């Protein structure tokens, strides 16, 4: 049973870590493109800034969904409850 808990902890770490890496890369690329486009056309800064913040929120929402799934696996793990139900007594 300890090996399953170890693998669950590893999976939770991977979910959160890779999600954070992906979100930070996505927001970094988006911010760079925002700066390029606002330098090219300064009259569109207000429209571009609004769209950039909406997209940043969507990117962060995907990461937070991953965090919620990792927390579900960490605290309300369906695999461990199934394992405990099927263990011989």
Curated annotation (Swiss-Prot):
The record's InterPro entries line, in alphabetical order, gives: ATP_synth_csu_bac/chlpt (IPR005953), ATP_synth_F0_csu (IPR000454), ATP_synth_F0_csu_DDCD_BS (IPR020537), ATP_synth_F0_csu_sf (IPR038662), ATPase_proteolipid_c-like_dom (IPR002379), F/V-ATP_Csub_sf (IPR035921)
Signal peptide region: none
Q: What is its main location?
A: membrane
**Site annotation Reversibly protonated during proton transport: residues:** 60
Q: Where are the transmembrane segments?
A: 3-23, 53-73
UniProt membrane topology term? Multi-pass membrane protein
Mind telling me which GO cellular component terms the entry cites? plasma membrane; proton-transporting ATP synthase complex; proton-transporting two-sector ATPase complex, proton-transporting domain
Compartments (UniProt record): Cell inner membrane
Q: What Gene3D superfamilies does this protein's entry cite?
A: F1F0 ATP synthase subunit C
The similarity comment for this entry is:
Belongs to the ATPase C chain family.
Q: What is this protein called?
A: ATP synthase subunit c
Q: Which organism is it from?
A: Verminephrobacter eiseniae (strain EF01-2)
């Amino acid at each position: 049973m300890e090996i399953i808990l170890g693998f669950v902890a590893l999976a939770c770490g991977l979910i959160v870590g890779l999600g954070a890496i992906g979100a930070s890369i996505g927001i970094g690329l988006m911010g760079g493109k925002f700066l390029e486009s606002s330098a090219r056309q300064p009259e569109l800064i207000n429209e571009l800034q609004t769209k950039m913040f909406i997209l940043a929120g969507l990117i962060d929402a995907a990461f937070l969904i991953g965090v919620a799934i990792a927390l579900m696996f960490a605290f309300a793990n369906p695999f461990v409850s199934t394992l405990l139900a099927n263990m011989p007594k």
